[in-house]
Swiss-Prot record:
The gene is msrP. It is found in: Periplasm. Heterodimer of a catalytic subunit (MsrP) and a heme-binding subunit (MsrQ). Mo-molybdopterin binds at N88, Y91, E92, C146, T181, N233, R238, G249, I250, K251. This is Protein-methionine-sulfoxide reductase catalytic subunit MsrP. One of its GO terms (molecular function) is oxidoreductase activity, acting on a sulfur group of donors, quinone or similar compound as acceptor. It comes from Escherichia coli (strain K12 / MC4100 / BW2952). The keyword Oxidoreductase applies.
Amino acid sequence: MKKNQFLKESDVTAESVFFMKRRQVLKALGISATALSLPHAAHADLLSWFKGNDRPPAPAGKALEFSKPAAWQNNLPLTPADKVSGYNNFYEFGLDKADPAANAGSLKTDPWTLKISGEVAKPLTLDHDDLTRRFPLEERIYRMRCVEAWSMVVPWIGFPLHKLLALAEPTSNAKYVAFETIYAPEQMPGQQDRFIGGGLKYPYVEGLRLDEAMHPLTLMTVGVYGKALPPQNGAPVRLIVPWKYGFKGIKSIVSIKLTRERPPTTWNLAAPDEYGFYANVNPYVDHPRWSQATERFIGSGGILDVQRQPTLLFNGYADQVASLYRGLDLRENF
């Protein structure tokens, strides 16, 4: 596998200071413009009003043992850990970027069960310890590109999904892989209340073609910055597919099911004209309401210092993954 294409130092996200454009979609789903314009403090008050204000802080992640394959290491300064953990989309905990960090401490991640089922010869069930002990862990420094046209560079820790799927032995009927987030409305206020969760249908679901899932880049991620994932980043296990937009990176996974037919995916169900099944990073295919030709790397000085640079096809991983889509019209299959 080829080594990562190097980024400039200015490419690394340093601060969370820009606006959510998907709010227009949420308004179409019935969430009021007034609610969407509320500042974070007001969102916090609303969460308290719906759920009470005694939310525990997220526990500190434990240190993990992992290797650092040379192909995925470089000397770039990384997005600061507090920005990666403090600036998230995880609508189960609220719409504001700061809501997941503020509210995800209520998520219980141990014990945990992850089931692999469907078109497999050997269905599997993994517990919390299996996620960090059954497979050798490695750190991979990946670009992360949000569909909202911002990006980060993050040192994820995990294991290739293909290793897990190989244990389950997909049958010849398996063509797709369906993923599902935990459904726990008593712990996730956005699942309990349509207002808080943006009107999406829960549990959150995602999917990949089997060949995408089996690609060496596709990572079952259990840690970041040397420690177990914090709840707001998708603990205890999430998906990272670095050549796709971030909403494909489903968090807090409890089910992986291999299927014959293409599975439904949450954002495609919510707005099929805006969020496709493939969701490959592509500067030549714009979102209906904004350009994807460039992306924002957010500097420490605030929104006026945000630097914009060209978006890379497949988020810079074209050499590794373009062959998966040979002959596929990427405009029609966005």
